[in-house]
Amino acid sequence: MTRAGCELLEVGTTNRTRLSDFSKVTDESAMLLKIHPSNFQIQGFTEQVSASELADLGTESGLPTCFDLGSGTIVDLTKFGLPRETTAQEVLSSGIDLITFSADKLLGGIQAGVIAGRKDLIDSIKQNPMKRALRADRITLVILESVLKLYDPPNDLEKNLPILRALTKPMAQLEQCAGQLTNAFPSAFEVKTIKTRAEIGSGAMPGEGIPSLSLRITHPKKDANKILRELRELPIPV
């Protein structure tokens, strides 16, 4: 941003942002940007601008629009029994010019960033001298391509994509894993399996969760900090 000579100006408030807040563009405005709330969710008296509303405003004002999707996904996750997350395709179909999202996390690939959208804007981004320093290397691209091919039909994503395989693991398998871990503790420890809701995290589905299990670990002579330290000092840290 410093190199480009631009300034990021926030609009609206923490819990309420209206289209009228975005509408206060000036001759110096260069882009309209909306950002995924990442790992938090605001409840109660809230208001936000939809992607389609922002896209329409961008068309009216002659400004490009960008939506940072955070984690990002390219499939409807509700098909796998997971909470809904807006897909990259849906945002682009709403008229947004550019989107950014992660290549790892929900997509299930290698750590990298993806920029997609209008070709002329992508071509302009490619001209930035910083691109050579920040672009993905060949190994990253090869791994990302192999992951994206898993999405080609016919596919069996919940079995072939590790992230989906983990998120959709049946409760029976989780119970089996919990039992194996419980049996691995020395007899002095008291280990109980409890039902919980796991947060996906990594900028995805804030406030949502999926049914999961946790282990509650206690010891008559060790407090929580000592147990935690011992777990972290194992050959395979926990």
Placement of each model-derived feature along the sequence:
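Generic secondary-structure boundary/loop-capping signal
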Residues: K79, A103-D104, I122, K131-A133, ...
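Structural motif of enzymes handling amino- and sulfur-group chemistry
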Residues: D120, N128-P129, A136-F185, R197, ...
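Conserved PLP-enzyme active-site core in the AAT-like
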Residues: T2-L150, P186
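Extended hydrophobic-aromatic, low-complexity segments
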Residues: S124-I125, L134, N155-D156, A224-L228
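Short N-terminal helix-initiation segments at or just after the protein's N-terminus
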Residues: S38-N39, E85, P153-I163, F189-T193
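Conserved C-terminal alpha-helix-loop-beta "cap" of PLP-dependent enzymes
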Residues: M171, E175-V238
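Short, well-ordered beta-strand elements within core beta-sheets of diverse protein domains
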Residues: E10, A166, L215-R216
